[in-house]
Amino acid sequence: ACSGKDFYKCIEESIKGGVKIVQLREKNISTKDFYEKALKVKEICKNYGVLFIINDRLDITQAVEADGVHLGQSDMPIEKAREILKDKFLIGATARNIEEAKKAELLGADYIGSGAIFGTSTKDNAKKLEMEDLKKIVNSVKIPVFAIGGININNISLLKNIGLQGICSVSGILSEKDCKKAVENILKNFN
């Protein structure tokens, strides 16, 4: 990712382009390395006043005092995470259908990430979510819904005007030469 550029520079440039939330997802590094990486990313986010979310790991979320944690369907149950984190942290949840979305909202999730909307290179096992199903999820809950999965400049306009709070993109930003410009272009075609 980042086309050979420095990871932290990519994050900073993406924020300058308009990113409002950064989520750090690491599956294959040690806890110590994750912690150290998260500290650096948190510092960047803090400097720019954007939210910082950790994927899956409540321990890292608490240790670096991130703004929140994002939980998938096979991660810590939302209610247990809320019991541990109290109201000090945001909790996001992945939902691929109306039932999961309503359950996440009921259990105390602050937002929902829903997808994969398009094919994605960052998650091998991601099942595609149809646009009509995404619209139904958006309309079934009162909490914000963000679309995830394979979103880039070529398909972002398909997500306009369906009630999403925002979108999540990894490769649509980091695979581009200019992360700042990639974000600006995606947002221009979404808003």
Task: List each language-model region with its residue ranges.
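Conserved N-terminal beta1-alpha1 strand-loop-helix module at the mouth
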Residues: 1-78, 82-111, 126-129, 136, ...
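Short hydrophobic "strand-cap" motifs at the C-terminus of beta-strands
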Residues: 148, 170
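Phosphate-binding beta-alpha-beta segment of Rossmann-like dinucleotide-binding domains, i.e.
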Residues: 114, 119-127
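Short acidic/polar capping segments at secondary-structure boundaries
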Residues: 117-118, 151-153
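Short, glycine/charged-rich "phosphate-handling" switch motifs in NTP-dependent
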Residues: 165
